[in-house]
Amino acid sequence: SSRSKKRIALTAALDRLHGRGIQVATEVLTLLREGFADAAFSRWRTLHEISVVAMVLGDHGEDLAVRYLDHDLVEAQRAADVFQRCHPKEAAQRKNVAELRQTKAEYDAVVAHYGPAFKSPYGWAAKHLGKEKPTFQHLEEAADQAQMRLQYKVASYGVHAGTKGLTSSVADVFGEGPPGAASIGGLHEAGIETAYSLVRVAGPLLGPNWSVDKLAGLKTLIKLRDAAAKAFSQGGRAIGEATWVSEDEIEAWQKEAER
């Protein structure tokens, strides 16, 4: 139908985001099974980014989705710039010169079409968010997910090489720094957030026109999400209670060790 044709780019973008979201959620599950809570939380960070983009696209529709997909040309040029800077000899080869020229021509055309604000990492959202250089935090606010900023920040500790990643860990139930191996501690954090983010990724796919089947499907997803979140929460609480150690017990162990 003509209505469905108007959502070609939006459907394509949301389908791809959903597929990638499922893949990342599977990675989270794999890490949880192996006891790597920090790594799982870091992968959830990616899933959160995917879900936020999906929600923003779902809210703003086809025009923004076209811009989002066209922004691939900007990313291609950024990669080309790095290639030429880091591998000048290879970049100077005839085959690569032709490809680089084509990439630059497509980049120039898309920037001329959308304007200079399109050049920034999230430039595809500049017009719709009313920001010259939108950031991911702006996307979170647009998706009504600003309350997730703290979780996102904590999850980032395990991604980068900052000192916070060396001194704290969601897996450490004793609060004395990150464990040196897999642990059962902290697994519930990534599990709960992943369950919620998966529903956020799937929601925009249902589109603006709600049918009985779509409502039933969404209701089922929410029930599964709530059940998973409850199970993870109960597991985390049980682990916390089982691993809690009083100061008296610690002091007694220290005295025993000194003998």
Place the predicted regions along the sequence by residue.
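Short, conserved micro-motifs enriched in small and acidic residues
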Residues: 15-18, 37-41, 185, 189
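Long, hydrophobic, well-ordered secondary-structure blocks that form the structural core
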Residues: 27, 33-81
